[in-house]
From Swiss-Prot:
E.C. number: 6.3.5.2
Entry protein name: GMP synthase [glutamine-hydrolyzing]
Organism: Bacillus cereus (strain G9842)
Reactions it catalyzes: XMP + L-glutamine + ATP + H2O = GMP + L-glutamate + AMP + diphosphate + 2 H(+)
Subunit architecture: Homodimer.
Record-linked InterPro entries: Class_I_gatase-like, GATASE, GMP_synth_C, GMP_synth_GATase, GMP_synthase, GMPS_ATP_PPase_dom, NAD/GMP_synthase, Rossmann-like_a/b/a_fold
Binding of ATP, residues: S225, G226, G227, V228, D229, S230, S231
Residue ranges constituting the Glutamine amidotransferase type-1 domain according to the UniProt record: 7-197
Matching Pfam families: GATase, GMP_synt_C, NAD_synthase
C-alpha cells in the first residue's frame, strides 16, 4: 500500500487477538499492518513505520518452540509496545526474568497505575483490563520501571521511556479492557507521534489500482452469495475491471428464505453484472448425506463450491482468477503460521490443491465493520450493506449433525421469523448477528392436548464490533416471546425454543 499515511507495524506472535490490534489502530485513522514475527529489521526499516507492536501469543518465551524476532528490531530506534507475550519477549531480550505464574490469569482484572508513563497519560489510576496469560514478568530488565500492577500480577505494565519501550501483561485491544483503546491511542499518538490520515477512501483508491495491476486484461470469477462480503467484493472488482468480471451464484440449497431470488434481482438487474446462476442443490445434498462432523461438512461444502466453479469455468473462456470475500477475521479463526486453529473457515479451508484459479481476496485486510463502511462508500444499498453476516456453508452449519431437507426447512422458516421480528422491533442495527440453529435434539411437549416429541430451535443473537469478541444480545422479553410463539405455531415439528446466552469467548458465534 502506498505510504501516504503514518503506519504502525504489528508483529504476529500467535495471539487470536492480534488482528484486533491493527483494527483498533485503524479506527483512529492510522494505517496498521500485521506481519509475521519472522520479518527482518531491514524489511521493517524499508516500510518506514512510526512504531512497532508485539502481539501476544500462546507460547512461553523460555519454552521449546518459543517464537522470537530479529533482535536488530530493538536497534531500529523505533517505539515498541509489547502486549502479553510481547512484553515477556522484550523482558527476556533486555535481561529481565519471566516465570510461569502460580495461577493462570484469564478474564477481567483491576489494574492499578503506579507510574504515569506516556502510555497511561490521562487514564484513571484504577481500571478494568482483560488478562489472558500463564507466565509473568518477575524481574524487570535494567532501565525499566513498573507502570502498573494487579492483584495477581505485580508487574502488569512496565516502561523504559528513554528508549520508548513499553509493555503490558493484559490485552488492551480486547473491548473488555475498559480503557484499552485510550491506552493504544496514547502509544500511537503520544509515543509514536502519528497523525490521522488513513480512511476508506484511501483503501478504495489503492485497492482498485491493485486489482487492475493484478488482473491486467485477464478475467475474474466471483463467488457471489448475496451476503455482505461477496457483494462488496463483486462491486469493488466490477468498479475496477468492469465486464472482465463474471459472477457465479451457486444455489447450494443451504440459503436463507428468499435469498436466491433476491441475489439475481439485485446484482443482475440492479448492478448490471454478468451473473450466472447454478442450481446445485441436489449435488450438495448428495455429498452431505450421512455426514455429521462439522469440520467435514465445512470441507465438503468448500470443496464442492470450488468444483462447481471448475465446472462452470470450463464452459467459459479464459477465467484466471477466483474472487473471494475472505476477511481478516476469517484468516485468524482458521489459524495462521502462529495462531492456534479454532475452526477451519469456509473462505480458507476446503480448497483443493489442484484448484485451477488464482485467488484474489481484496477484503482480506478488513474487518466486518470496515467492509460495511466500504460497501456504503461504493454506493451499495443499505439493505445489502447491513445484511446479516452469513457463513459460506450457509444453513449447513446451523443444522447440527446430519443435514436433511426437513431440518433445513425448520431452520430456514424459523430464521425468517426471527429476522422479521427483529426488524419489526427496530433491533436489526443494534444486534450484530442473529439467527436460529437446530441442535438436533428432540423433547416432549403438549400441543392441542396431544403429546409431541419434536425439535428444539436455538436462537443466537450477539452484539459485536468485528466478530473477534461478542456478547449475547439482551433482546427484550416481549420480543423473544413473540418470536418463540410464532416459531412454535408456524414451523412444523418444533415444540421448544431456547436462547443462547454465551459470549465469545468461550463460545464461537456460530454453533458449528
Amino acid at each position: 500500500m502506498k505510504k501516504q499515511h503514518d503506519t504502525i507495524i504489528v508483529l504476529d506472535f500467535g495471539s487470536q487477538y492480534n488482528q484486533l490490534i491493527a483494527r483498533r489502530i485503524r479506527e483512529f485513522g492510522v494505517y496498521s499492518e500485521l506481519h509475521p514475527h519472522t520479518i527482518t529489521a531491514e524489511e521493517i526499516k524499508a516500510m518506514n513505520p512510526k512504531g512497532i507492536i508485539f502481539s501476544g501469543g500462546p507460547n512461553s518465551v523460555y519454552g521449546e518452540g518459543a517464537l522470537h524476532c530479529d533482535e536488530k528490531i530493538f536497534e531500529l530506534g523505533l517505539p515498541i509496545f509489547g502486549i502479553c507475550y510481547g512484553m515477556q519477549l522484550m523482558t527476556q531480550h533486555f535481561g529481565g526474568k519471566v516465570e510461569r505464574a502460580n495461577h493462570r490469569e484469564y478474564g477481567k482484572a483491576v489494574l492499578k497505575v503506579e507510574n504515569e508513563s506516556k502510555l497511561y497519560a490521562n487514564l484513571p489510576e484504577e481500571q478494568v483490563v482483560w488478562m489472558s496469560h500463564g507466565d509473568l514478568v518477575t524481574g524487570l530488565p535494567e532501565g525499566f520501571v513498573v507502570d502498573a500492577t494487579s492483584e495477581s500480577c505485580p508487574i502488569a505494565g512496565m516502561s523504559n521511556e528513554e528508549k520508548n519501550l513499553y509493555g503490558v501483561q493484559f490485552h488492551p485491544e480486547v473491548r473488555h479492557s475498559e480503557h484499552g483503546n485510550d491506552l493504544i491511542k496514547n502509544f500511537v499518538f503520544g509515543v509514536c507521534g502519528c497523525s490521522e490520515g488513513w480512511n476508506m477512501e484511501n483503501f478504495i483508491e489503492v485497492e482498485l489500482e491493485k486489482i487492475r495491476e493484478t488482473v491486467g486484461d485477464k478475467k475474474v470469477l466471483c463467488a457471489l452469495s448475496g451476503g455482505v462480503d461477496s457483494s462488496v467484493v463483486a462491486v469493488l472488482i466490477h468498479k475496477a475491471i468492469g465486464d472482465q468480471l463474471t459472477c457465479i451464484f451457486v444455489d447450494h440449497g443451504l440459503l436463507r428464505k428468499g435469498e436466491a431470488e433476491g441475489v439475481m434481482k439485485t446484482f443482475s438487474e440492479g448492478f448490471h453484472m454478468n451473473v450466472i446462476k447454478v442450481d446445485a442443490q441436489e449435488r450438495f445434498m448428495n455429498k452431505l448425506k450421512g455426514v455429521e462432523d462439522p469440520e467435514q461438512k465445512r470441507k465438503i461444502i468448500g470443496n464442492e463450491f470450488i468444483y462447481v466453479f471448475d465446472d462452470e469455468a470450463s464452459k467459459l473462456q479464459g477465467m484466471d482468477f477466483l474472487a473471494q470475500g475472505t476477511l481478516y477475521t476469517d484468516i485468524v479463526e482458521s489459524g495462521t503460521a502462529t495462531a492456534q486453529t479454532i475452526k477451519s473457515h469456509h473462505n480458507v479451508g476446503g480448497l483443493p490443491e489442484d484448484m485451477q484459479f488464482k485467488l484474489i481476496e481484496p477484503l482480506n485486510t478488513l474487518f466486518k465493520d470496515e467492509v460495511r463502511v466500504l460497501g456504503s462508500e461504493l454506493g451499495i444499498p443499505d439493505e445489502i450493506v447491513w445484511r446479516q453476516p452469513f457463513p459460506g456453508p450457509g444453513l449447513g452449519i446451523r443444522v447440527l449433525g446430519e443435514i436433511t431437507e426437513e431440518k433445513l426447512e425448520i431452520v430456514r422458516e424459523s430464521d425468517a421469523i426471527l429476522r422479521e421480528e427483529i426488524i419489526k422491533a427496530g433491533l436489526d442495527r443494534e444486534i450484530w448477528q442473529y439467527f436460529t440453529a437446530l441442535p438436533g435434539m428432540r423433547s416432549v411437549g403438549v400441543m392441542g392436548d396431544e403429546r409431541t416429541y419434536d425439535y428444539t430451535v436455538g436462537i443466537r443473537a450477539v452484539t459485536s464490533i468485528d466478530g473477534m469478541t461478542a456478547d449475547w444480545a439482551r433482546i427484550p422479553w416481549d420480543v423473544l416471546e413473540k418470536i418463540s410463539v410464532r416459531i412454535v405455531n408456524e414451523v412444523k415439528h418444533v415444540n421448544r425454543i431456547v436462547y443462547d446466552v454465551t459470549s465469545k469467548p468461550p463460545a464461537t458465534i456460530e454453533w458449528e
